[in-house]
Each structure stands twice: as C-alpha cells, then as structure tokens.
Amino acid sequence: MNIEEGTATVVRDALGKRCVEVTFDGRRYTKSGEKPAAPREFVFLFDDSISVNVLSFPTCGRAVLAAQGPAGCPPGSKVGTGRAEFYGGGEAEVAVYNTRFANGMRGVLITVPALGTILDNTLEPVRGTYRRNYTLGLHEIVQPDGVPPQERGATSRFVVTFGATWHGRSFVESHARAGRPLDLGIWSHYVTGQVNLTEGQVARP
C-alpha cells in the first residue's frame, strides 16, 4: 500500500496583491520499502478563493510539446516548474505549460522533458463534498502505455509549482484576505484501486 505525505506553500508572485504561486510537494513510499504502486490519476485541489487564468496566457499544444520539446512552445505559455525524484534514485526537472485540449477543455501539460513524459491535466470544477473547501481541480489521468503497471517507473517525490506572469496578469490568483487559511489538497488513485486524499491549510500571504 502506498503511503502519502505532502505539504503546500503559497507565495505572492512578482505582481503581488491577489497574485500568487502555489506549490504542491508530495511524497509517496511503502512500509516495506518496495516501489510504490503506479498511479492511475491525480487531482490537484485548489482553495475556493483561487482562480486559474488559463484564458490570459498563450497555449502550447500537446503535439508541439511532444515533437519539439519546451523550445517549441510560445513565450508566455510556461506557467509552472517543479522537480521529480524517482524511486531507486535520480531526479529530473518538471515544467508546466498552459494548453487547450482538442475537446475545447482548458488546463495544463505537466512534462518531464528529460524523459519525454507529458501528463494532461484538465481544469475542472470540483464535485460533491469537495465543494465545501475547493472550487477547481487540475485532473490528471495517466494514460496506459503498454508497460505493465508493476514495471512502470515511480516517483518518491513530486514537486510542482503553478504560477507565472504575462503582460500584467498572473496565472494564479486568490481573492482571500491576507492571513486567511487556504485549503489545498491532492487526490490520488492508483492501479491497485487504492485512493488517497492528502489535505492541508496554509495562510494566504
């Protein structure tokens, strides 16, 4: 069984006031020390005071990112950074790009350029009881690639920051007053059927 721990931080970006950057820092491991089970999907959950300004930033298409790498994406489309640490050792940089999917939905592409990995994250309103604390989530579904789940690589730590500025706009904003606790979380679903929810609060800067 996977065990998850995580923290989140929120800081003001270069524009200040309502403009922020949100970082999720998640760790996963097993009691036995074995490789964690492969993920099926994740949802990054954002406080109900937070908005994500996908319409104010240029977009990078998945096909462009896959064919040309980050160099092919237009200026202003990069909206986040991060780092992946892998089970068994090694790490790699992570980058986040604003995108529009073929079905018209908006969201981001989280990529590990060194591995050629691209993860689709659709921006969606949360549903059910999650609406008590959250308004939006970035929903990531890990597509099967023919590799058996037990043979897939696994991360022991994944850090991702959502935040950027472009022509006077911030990618992430919060209308909460300074000092108010912000709810942030990560919902996880693994190929074993296990479901986890890691939640916490951080003061609005």
Residue ranges and their predicted role:
Residues 1-205:
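Ser/Thr/Pro/Gly-rich, low-complexity intrinsically disordered stalk/linker tracts of secreted
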